[in-house]
From Swiss-Prot:
Domain BPL/LPL catalytic positions: 29-216
Subcellular locations according to the entry: Cytoplasm
Gene behind this protein: lplA
Species annotation: Escherichia coli O9:H4 (strain HS)
Family: Belongs to the LplA family.
Entry annotated with the keyword Ligase: yes
Classification via PANTHER family: LIPOATE-PROTEIN LIGASE, LIPOYLTRANSFERASE 1, MITOCHONDRIAL
Keywords for this protein: ATP-binding, Cytoplasm, Ligase, Nucleotide-binding
Binding site for ATP: R71, G76, A77, V78, F79, K134
Residues that bind (R)-lipoate: K134
Protein name: Lipoate-protein ligase A
Length: 338
């Protein structure tokens, strides 16, 4: 019986694909070597310990229907669209070795006619007249008895959109998380015009088989039916939840300020695990009472636009004469924290 397993996803849903990856990783036998090939529609994927409000322009993402997905590995934020091919290599220990999976990807690129090399901790680069350009980035995860290496190859990604979503708003955002280094990147279509996702998947598959001297039939994972994987439904529910994607952010502070016709407002939030642990409001409004009441209501509130808006509007009962001000405040806050 083959020790290899090849899975190819037909889904473009990042939460679905990451849930598939997680389920396979948890239940695979330690003797198995797995290759999973997939891609995501418009998504920002962040590392396990990253702060989405720091790393991403979450407001623009919401406007453009770009999803946020937190992966279980470390590393930085990346933008995925259908111009990316994603790969995951998994193996039990002691056999797991990320240099093997890296060499498989390099061999696949070489077979396609691209000479690339490993650079730094987790990048693959090609040499161009303008200098080295990144075509692949990776991240890794290890447990006591297994490990995985996953990454992306830039085929024909919209690099201008990459900058749109990975450059955060210029907010006064003092985070305890770390901002990722942005790398200079290029698409493989610049070197191989017309290269497709299917061709890249085939090349990686051939290099995978060649390395291990075995072949195996591909298992197609379809979004049309629930994958036959242990605990998939629970894993997908967690992967797609606000609590996982946003609520796992490291502690941070956020300062919002705005001037309205009725006065200036400064809001100071301390946020931990997606909840406001401290809220302070400063204002030169002639009627500060509703704002002072708001600070009390926001303590413990989820740091989510709809929840903050709800707390603002709840004050209308106690402060009906300030309806105009409270509605303006509510609209501004909801937009500012997206």
């Amino acid at each position: 019986m083959s020790t290899l397993r090849l899975l190819i996803s037909d889904s473009y849903d990042p939460w679905f694909n990451l849930a598939v990856e997680e389920c396979i990783f948890r239940q695979m036998p330690a003797t198995q070597r797995v290759l999973f090939l997939w891609r995501n529609a418009d998504t920002v994927v962040i590392g396990r310990a990253q702060n989405p409000w720091k790393e991403c322009n979450t407001r623009r993402m919401e406007e453009d229907n770009v999803r946020l997905a937190r992966r279980s590995s470390g590393g930085g934020a990346v933008f995925h669209d259908l111009g990316n091919t994603c790969f995951t290599f998994m193996a039990g220990k002691p056999e797991y070795d990320k240099t093997i999976s890296t060499s498989i990807v390099l061999n696949a690129l070489n077979a396609l006619g691209v000479s690339a090399e490993a650079s730094g901790r987790n990048d693959l680069v090609v040499k161009t007249a303008e200098g080295d350009r990144k075509v692949s980035g990776s991240a890794y995860r290890e447990t006591k008895d297994r490990g995985f290496h996953h990454g992306t190859l830039l085929l024909n990604a919209d690099l201008s959109r990459l900058a749109n979503y990975l450059n955060p708003d210029k907010k006064k955002l003092a985070a305890k998380g770390i901002t990722s280094v942005r790398s200079r990147v290029t698409n493989l279509t610049e070197l191989l015009p017309g290269i497709t996702h299917e061709q890249v998947c085939e090349a990686i598959t051939k290099a995978f088989f060649a390395h291990y001297g075995e072949r195996v039939e591909a298992e197609i994972i379809s979004p049309d039916k629930t994958p036959d994987l242990p605990n998939f439904a629970e894993t997908f529910a967690r992967q797609s939840s606000w609590e996982w994607n946003f609520g796992q952010a490291p502690a941070f502070s956020h300062l919002l300020d705005e001037r309205f016709s009725w006065g200036g407002v400064e809001l100071h939030f301390d946020v931990e695990k997606g909840h406001i642990t401290r809220a302070q409001v400063f204002t030169d409004s002639l009627n500060p009472a509703p704002l002072e009441a708001l600070a009390g209501r926001l303590q413990g509130c989820l740091y989510r636009a709809d929840m903050l808006q709800q707390e603002c509007e709840a004050l209308l009962v106690d402060f009906p004469d300030q309806e105009k001000e409270l509605r303006e405040l509510s609209t501004w806050i909801a937009g500012a924290v997206r």
